[in-house]
Amino acid sequence: MPTRSLPTFLTLLLLASIDWVSKLVVLLKSCQLSPHSSAFLYSYVWGHFSFLIIPSFNEGAAFGLFAQYKIPLLIFRVCVILGLALFLRIKYKSLHRRTRIALTLILAGALGNVGDILLHGKVVDFLFLSYYSWRFPSFNLADAFISIGTLLLIGHLYFNKESKKCF
C-alpha cells in the first residue's frame, strides 16, 4: 500500500470501527434495560425537536427496502464496496481530495453496515429524529457517513468548475 493512501485507509478503518463500537454499546446498554423501563436509551427534547437513541433492526436496504432479498442484497453491497475500494485504490493520486474524503466516508459506512449483516443478519439502527409530527426513519453512524459522503460528492461534482479534477 502506498504511503500516500495510508491515512485514507486508516481513516476508513477508524470510521468503520467507531460505527461498530457505537452499535455494540447500544446493544449492550439495551440488554441492561429492565422489561419495565422505556425502550429508549437516551432522549433529548428541545421545543418540537426530539432526538432519541432507540435500538432497532433493519433487514433490508434504506428504509427496509428489499428485505426479502437478503443474499442478493448482501452480494450487491459487497460488490459495491469492492468496486469503490478498487476505484479509490487505482485512481487515488488523480482524485481530488474532496472526492477521496467523500468516497472514504461512503466506504466506511458501507463496511459498517455490511459488518452488521455478517454478524447479526441485519443492520443495527439506533438514532431517531423527529420534528413536530415528522419522524425520520431510524439510522446509525454508518448511514450518516454514507449520506454525508454522498452529499460531499454531489456538492463537489456540482460546484467544481473543472469536472476533470473530481475523477
From Swiss-Prot:
Q: Which stretches are transmembrane?
A: 8-28, 46-66, 68-88, 101-121, 139-159
Q: What is its main location?
A: membrane
What PROSITE patterns does its record include? SPASE_II
Location of this chain's protein in the cell: Cell inner membrane
Entry coiled-coil feature ranges: none
Membrane topology (UniProt) = Multi-pass membrane protein
Q: Which GO terms describe its biological process?
A: proteolysis
Active site annotated at which positions?
Answer: 125, 143
Give the keywords, sorted: Aspartyl protease, Cell inner membrane, Cell membrane, Hydrolase, Membrane, Protease, Transmembrane, Transmembrane helix
The EC number on file is: 3.4.23.36
Q: Which residues form the signal peptide?
A: none
Molecular function terms from GO: aspartic-type endopeptidase activity
- List the InterPro entries: Peptidase_A8 (IPR001872)
UniProt pathway annotation: Protein modification; lipoprotein biosynthesis (signal peptide cleavage)
Q: Which reaction does it catalyse?
A: Release of signal peptides from bacterial membrane prolipoproteins. Hydrolyzes -Xaa-Yaa-Zaa-|-(S,diacylglyceryl)Cys-, in which Xaa is hydrophobic (preferably Leu), and Yaa (Ala or Ser) and Zaa (Gly or Ala) have small, neutral side chains
**Cellular component, GO, one term:** plasma membrane
Q: What does this protein do?
A: This protein specifically catalyzes the removal of signal peptides from prolipoproteins.
Q: Which protein family is it in?
A: Belongs to the peptidase A8 family.
For this entry, the protein name equals Lipoprotein signal peptidase
- From which source organism is this entry? Chlamydia trachomatis serovar L2b (strain UCH-1/proctitis)
The coding gene here is lspA
